[in-house]
Amino acid sequence: MTLGTAVSVAVALLATAAPADAFAATANTHHAAKKTASASSAKKKSVKAASEKSAKVASADAPRAKASRKRVTLASNVHGHRGAVRKVAFQPRRPTVGQAFGLHDTPDALALRSSVAYVVDQNTGEPLFDKNSHAVVPIASISKLMTSMVVLDSKAPMNEQIEVTDEDRDYEKNTGSRLSVGSVLSREDMLHIALMASENRAAAALSRYYPGGRPAFIAAMNAKAKALGMTDTHFENSTGLSSSNVSSARDLVKMVNAAYQYPMIRQFSTDRTYDVYTGKRNLVYNSTNALIRGNGSWDIGLQKTGFINEAGECLVMQATIHGRPMVMVLLDSFGKYSRFADAARLRNWLDAGGGERLTAANTANGGT
């Protein structure tokens, strides 16, 4: 899949909504239909208020159960019965770009749930596991690694105070944030929670405070990608909420290796928890990575999670396994915890010598 094709498909999927009449209710009389419509209209304000309240606690890496299917409830009077019959249906979630291209159907020896899986020896660059590493797909909040490098490359004062404004709200996906408009944090704190907790408004505010503003920031992201040789990569924003932020696993290895050279990115991305004061209240943020929050059995030097509907569940990280530093990329995984389970399967496979067997087979076949 090429870069241009991936962007086009992502835009098409975003524009295509599930059918509004996925489950139709019937009404026997015009009076019953009017009654139902009237009741629906009367509830509009309360439903809207509840929706806005729910959005405030949502995030790019929030629980997926509510986002996976849209609930549709319709009511009607049947055969003159006084009680309304309520019918409930669920509109299926639109496919990811990977699903649209059939990447989920690619078989692999470990039965991974990720459409894309790529493991590379960080020291030698040798591929140890490869599943669709050339595929160009949306990468969601993995984009924040590039965001962080551009922020640090700017050499802007890390103690400068940055205020969240209405411009930093997400009007594309309507995700919520714990950082309310008017919150003020230092550039360092914004970067910390953008990496560790995938805080979207923090990433958006960082791009707005860049010299030349947001357009200059996005240009710097793409220039950095080009300088790193990331030919399959394109960025449209600093948060990753745009499905037009795309890359391949091979390119993401280059980005992880580059980000690993920044001590602050290594530290911030692997912290388990962090407290900030917004000028209004204290907030406690936690890592979005279950492997970081777990029992400490992983030796992770850098990581970033990501999720939007078009990208599926994503994870990139640098980890040391059996004393061997590796870069692991998992994209378009299906199921909230599947990316972490896939990472565990890959580690177990490597522990059992899977990487060495693959290397030996490649050498015997004259491969690389």
Language-model-detected regions and their locations in the chain:
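N-terminal secretory targeting signals
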Residues: 1-113, 352-368
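Secondary-structure junction/capping motif
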Residues: 2, 174, 186, 213, ...
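Ubiquitous "structural anchor" signal
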Residues: 12, 133, 156, 314, ...
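Short, hinge-like loop/turn segments at secondary-structure boundaries
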Residues: 24, 180-181, 286, 346
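Active-site-adjacent loops and short helices of periplasmic peptidoglycan-processing enzymes
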Residues: 75-250, 254-263, 321
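Domain-terminus/edge residues, biased toward the C-terminal soluble/receptor-binding domains
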Residues: 230, 234, 240, 244-368
